[in-house]
Each structure stands twice: as C-alpha cells, then as structure tokens.
C-alpha cells in the first residue's frame, strides 16, 4: 500500500502578461497577416471571453448603447450577458463589417492559432497561450476592485474557486493596497 502514490492536484496555469509584454504583443499584432488580430487580443482581455466565444460573437448581440453583449456560444452551453468596457465598445465600433455578421472574419481556429502563435513569438513572449488572455483580463479587473461575483458573471465561471485560478493578484499589488490603508 505504501508504494501507491496518491493523486496530486493538477497544476493550473497562471500566466499573466506584464505591462511590457502587453505593449510588445499589441505591436506584434499590428504586423499580423490577420487584420483584426490586435482587436481580437484586446477584446479577449477586455471581455474575458474564451477564444470560441469571441470568434463566434455577432454584431447583433452587441448593444453598444447599453454596453452589453450576449455571448451565445459558451463553454457551459448556456448563453450569458457580459458588460462591454468603453475600450471594448470603441474596438467593436471600429471593426469592419463582415458578411456573416460575426465581429471577426476568421477562416478557421487552426489558422487563427497559427497567427496568434506567430505574433506571440515575434513579440518575444515565452510560454503564452490565447487562453492566458483570460488570466490577464481577470487579474486586471480584480486589481481594479471587481468582486468575485462580478468576475464570475463576466468570465462565465461557476465558482469562486475558478475565479481564484484566473485572477492572479501578486504580492506587489497586495503591498500597494496595504500602503493605501
């Protein structure tokens, strides 16, 4: 019995872009073959949407007046409403219209992933995946004071535990908050 190893908790990714990496990534996106790459990356951070949710988002589901969007194709299969920041609204307003009504004209997930990997590599960023943009966005919103409930709704997470995996508040931020008391 002593030879049997107990299962361990899986190691979860907690990769968040630094400010410098964000600038480098945005600059690299500007040179992408995919015209809307920067808009996709920025909206992923701003909205906390998963890749599939974002690439399937339609103009008709974005109410730029109220600042809300309906994400129909979610991981859970249940549509959810999200808030749109001022920056997200600005990005959506400036997107060229597509024939199929989607925000982005992306041919396939595999071609998109190749383009995204290319801009990350050209930006000099190591060990970074598209899904890590959710970590970056959740962390930024948490540092701005968003509650767990707000983050759960925006990101489509079903538990506070999941939010804690994505919102990676560092010791530097905690020290800054304590100094302001």
Predicted feature descriptions by range:
Residues 1-51, 55-56, 65, 75-76, ...:
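Basic, Lys/Arg- and aromatic-enriched nucleic-acid-binding interface segment
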Residues 18, 25, 116, 163-166:
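Mobile genetic element proteins and their domesticated derivatives, centered on retroelements
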Residues 85-126:
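Active-site/catalytic core of tyrosine-dependent DNA strand-transfer enzymes
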